[in-house]
């Protein structure tokens, strides 16, 4: 399988409402089409994740100008900003209980192309069962999780990133102040 095939199979799986295991610019993640309520529910279930712990969405870089720097950064926006100003089409079970939503622009050609072809944000959360350590590489992903997702993107060499830690997380408060949640 080549990169073009991997992208097409991933987009097809997402359009069919499937959950996926895929590489990002930080660590391997599991995700789904952010517009698909049922797929988001299945993602919470397969990770055994409490709904109080929201998941972030990856968005296409051409539409967003958020942060720049050496380390990928997830921004958590309050509902009044992401809902009214960002025009995101996402499932209603994706934002946190307080209405906030984590958003990141991935610096990863595979993710960018999948998001572009899908035409929608991609849910992203670490490829681990809730409460367990995040895997630093594909070989550390638990077999149980690989069995639970509907589609696994193959670990092609051109898809692997040298970055092996989660993104920095900054929460934007309604008044515009910023709080660093994960440096």
Question: What kind of region is each of these model predictions?
Answer:
Residues 1-183:
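Active-site-adjacent structural elements in enzyme catalytic cores
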């Amino acid at each position: 399988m080549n990169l073009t095939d991997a992208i097409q199979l991933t987009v097809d799986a997402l359009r069919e409402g499937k959950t996926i295991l895929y590489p990002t610019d930080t660590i391997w993640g599991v995700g789904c089409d952010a517009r698909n309520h049922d797929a988001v529910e299945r993602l919470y279930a397969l990770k055994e994740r409490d709904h109080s712990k929201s998941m972030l969405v990856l968005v296409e870089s051409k539409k967003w100008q958020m942060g720049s720097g050496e380390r990928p950064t997830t921004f958590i926006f309050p509902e009044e900003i992401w809902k009214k100003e960002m025009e995101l089409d996402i499932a209603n079970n994706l934002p946190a209980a307080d209405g906030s939503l984590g958003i990141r622009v991935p610096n990863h050609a595979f993710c960018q192309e999948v998001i572009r072809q899908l035409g929608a944000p991609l849910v992203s959360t670490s490829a681990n069962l809730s409460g367990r350590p995040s895997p630093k590489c594909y070989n550390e992903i638990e077999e149980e999780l690989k069995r639970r997702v509907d589609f696994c993107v193959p670990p092609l060499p051109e898809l692997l990133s040298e970055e092996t830690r989660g993104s920095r997380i900054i929460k934007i408060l309604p008044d515009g102040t910023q709080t660093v949640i994960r440096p």
